[in-house]
């Protein structure tokens, strides 16, 4: 039975009670974007967009940490922060490329589309990794109130979510908005528990399969009996091994940082080391705030006990240093609490996944080496893998025994340095895919026209000679063209380097050099699209396009003939107006349209027409 856990006999030879997979997920229902557990807990999950923290200036980093510390002070008592890595899902991007290819009229460009699609498929199936970040918190009832209504619970959780949105915006993070919050929560658990199946079977298809299986029971009320876990649980879960568990064709191992496994001092954003360790590495951070008054009392009591012990200990005894350090640490915590900081217990759980036991052991060894290089330590949760697995679920419910064993006491300032929403990714939705980030294997996709992310679309490509600046520019231009974005490249000295690219995409090459058949008609008038400006500033009064063009032509001629007199400028102005009038163009913008060909411009004059008008007048001949 795929729904029954496989467990090993205990040391006394007794089999552990058989338990179904449904029992592992204590989810009673999902409603209003809230998880209702079977233990009468109400869980809210928010997805957070990360920032590239390490590229920010020291001043900006301090600002982020201070804002995160402010968030911790007003957040619920128990928090879980989760980062989740998996193979990048490029299906949505591939669908967009296929639509662009279908709408492309040029057969040669469609061939380039097919090549681009194959490239994206290869990256998505082999190299690319995507990361998602979550914060999980639960409803915490006031101690002096009873009979709280469900509406009040929802309101409290929504208020907490708004606080996260406000303070995280100060950090530079945004909360991802989902059209259907209930479906989002289901997808989170489905993806976490079915790492292999979720790549091949989307959630919607899984939902249809579950509905079909219940309808096959010929029970009119079958759909009402479907538990939420039915859409999430993996096909199998093997718990027979002490060092790992096997779930949905993937091996999972769980490690934790012991209380003495941290460095004495860490820098802000140090968790970027773990978060960006690579594919198959997930990180869970648990924080639990303690009552300040009770902790002040306990710390003071422990200081007094240690001071009494150290009086009876010789300074040559090995215990003397331990007691001395404990006393100093106690005073440090006491001073911090007196300076308006809070006391927290923190624990970090690291999940390592792989397709085989060999790969799993290799990844465990590599992540341990990485931590040792930073003077930190990781311990495998041997024979506690099930408890660690349940702790890793986004339910803000770490196993009590594990949390007590591995927790570390910290203050607010230290907790803020655990800021987890750190990533090296540059992956913009609807951007042009450039490749894979070699530092953390994330996709590099750029959409510099996204006003939601960037203040403007300006971009600079810097590098040494031969580093690939021109190639990068060609790559961006090529893939923007494949995405249907018009691309213009002005290359005064390196135009020959773009010639082959333009020919391959059936582009137009314009050479502005002496003897070239191509030239620019400086007298051409084209209406400017003011749609974006009107959206920002409202409707603006219409201005004459001819008047604006005449002003620009005066600037043009003043550069050619700097010593024009006022009388000559007046004569030139009259000649320009006459030249446009001869083509039927007046100060009215409607005169720009060609009545013989609706939707097209009239034939525009050229400098030769202006020369003819000047030559025909006696005063300008």
Where are these regions (language model features)?
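Pre-P-loop entry segment of helicase/translocase ATPase cores
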Residues: 409-417, 424-441
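Non-catalytic, charge-rich alpha-helical accessory subdomains
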Residues: 341-342, 358-359, 369-375, 564-621
């Amino acid at each position: 039975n795929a729904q029954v856990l496989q467990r090993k006999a205990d040391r006394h030879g007794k089999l552990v009670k058989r338990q179904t997979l449904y029992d592992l997920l204590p989810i009673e229902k999902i409603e209003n974007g809230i998880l209702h557990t079977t233990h009468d807990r109400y869980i809210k999950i928010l997805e957070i967009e990360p920032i590239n923290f390490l590229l920010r200036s020291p001043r900006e980093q301090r600002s982020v940490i201070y804002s995160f510390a402010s968030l911790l002070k007003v957040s619920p008592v128990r928090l879980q922060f989760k980062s989740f890595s998996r193979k990048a899902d490029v299906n949505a991007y591939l669908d967009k490329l296929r639509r662009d290819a279908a709408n492309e009229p040029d057969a040669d460009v469609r061939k380039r589309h097919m090549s681009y699609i194959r490239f994206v498929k290869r990256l998505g199936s082999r190299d690319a990794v995507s990361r998602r970040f979550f914060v999980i918190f639960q409803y915490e009832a006031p101690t002096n109130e009873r009979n709280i209504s469900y509406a009040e619970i929802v309101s409290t959780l929504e208020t907490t979510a708004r606080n996260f949105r406000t303070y995280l915006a100060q950090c530079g993070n945004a909360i991802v908005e989902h059209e259907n919050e209930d479906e989002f929560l289901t997808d989170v658990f489905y993806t976490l528990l079915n790492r292999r199946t979720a790549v091949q079977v989307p959630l919607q298809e899984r939902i249809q399969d579950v509905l079909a299986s219940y309808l096959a029971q010929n029970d009119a009320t079958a759909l009402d009996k479907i538990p939420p876990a039915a859409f999430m649980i993996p096909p199998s879960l093997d718990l027979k091994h002490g060092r790992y568990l096997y779930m949905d064709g993937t091996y999972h191992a769980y490690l934790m940082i012991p209380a003495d496994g941290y460095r004495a001092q860490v820098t802000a954003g140090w968790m970027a080391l773990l978060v960006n360790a690579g594919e198959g590495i997930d990180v869970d951070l648990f924080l639990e705030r303690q009552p300040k008054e009770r902790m002040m009392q306990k710390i003071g009591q422990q200081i007094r006990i240690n001071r009494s012990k150290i009086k009876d200990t010789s300074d040559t005894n090995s215990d003397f240093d331990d007691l001395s350090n404990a006393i100093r640490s106690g005073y440090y915590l006491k001073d911090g609490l007196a300076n308006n900081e809070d006391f927290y217990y923190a624990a970090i759980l690291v999940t390592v996944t792989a397709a085989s036991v060999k790969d799993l052991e290799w990844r465990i060894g590599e992540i341990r080496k990485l931590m040792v290089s930073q003077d930190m330590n990781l311990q495998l949760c041997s024979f506690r893998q099930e408890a660690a697995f349940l702790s890793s679920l986004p339910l803000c419910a770490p196993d009590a025994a594990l949390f007590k064993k591995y927790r570390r006491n910290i203050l607010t300032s230290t907790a803020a340095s655990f800021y987890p929403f750190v990533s090296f990714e540059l992956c913009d939705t609807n951007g042009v895919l450039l490749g894979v980030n070699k530092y953390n294997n994330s996709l590099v996709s750029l959409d510099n026209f996204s006003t939601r992310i960037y203040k403007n679309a300006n971009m600079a490509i810097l590098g040494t000679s031969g580093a690939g600046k021109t190639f990068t520019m060609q790559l961006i231009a090529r893939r923007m063209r494949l995405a249907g974005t018009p691309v213009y490249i002005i290359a005064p000295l390196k135009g020959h380097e773009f010639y082959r690219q333009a020919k391959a995409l059936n582009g137009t090459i314009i050479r502005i050099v002496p003897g070239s058949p191509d030239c620019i008609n400086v007298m051409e008038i084209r209406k400017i699209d003011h749609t974006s400006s009107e959206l920002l500033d409202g409707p603006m009064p219409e201005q004459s396009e001819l008047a604006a063009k005449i002003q620009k032509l005066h600037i043009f001629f003043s550069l050619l003939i700097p010593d024009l007199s006022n009388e000559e400028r007046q004569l030139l102005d009259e000649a320009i107006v006459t030249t446009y009038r001869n083509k039927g163009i007046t100060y009215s913008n409607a005169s720009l349209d060609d009545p013989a060909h609706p939707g097209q411009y009239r034939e525009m004059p050229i400098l030769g027409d202006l020369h003819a008008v000047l030559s025909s007048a006696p005063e300008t001949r």
